[in-house]
């Protein structure tokens, strides 16, 4: 089910050109939040979603939404001005118990407060978030924002969330960034291995995330590599001493010149 935007169905329809049999598609053009299609087909084992970022939706202006089984478990609705977490709750609701969902997200959903923090709390406390992957900026057409991928699962082995910083996994192409196959393989390998790797990835207990006020920003947990040049203080002090000595020599020469000028004057 796609959001009620022409480009969504156009992108979906274009996939028919990628050598995939048309009988494997069931394309629906509707509103995923207020009028979803494919009710008879859910739950799904695999869900991939790139919903529009921070669009408006009915939210609590529609009294039916808070009782909708897709949204009601969180006890609160996503803000009317930012539907991001409504799309996430929709995907979670339609996900099979053994399935996996991957949703491209606007970064604000990871740290904004209010109702969105309450929804994150629901997702973390119920152990539904498997992984957060920070992507490079300038990756998608129409926005330079560094987006992220939220991976959802309903049957996880550990009560933890995996964080991957893939913000540097790209190549520059004109004014945009692009993921090469090597970049994608690196990200996938990190996700599969679920190993702590300095400046790249870390597995964080959900209790620690709760202590961080349910902030899911990757930078909160994966420390950025310090690329600043290491300065040798001894060498720096020696250079400063040379400058001070040179400055004094110049001052003496200037004073000598001034004295000679005064004599001739």
Predicted segments with their positions:
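Single conserved hydrophobic/aromatic residue that forms the stacking wall/gate
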Residues: 1-12
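S-adenosyl-L-methionine
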Residues: 14-42
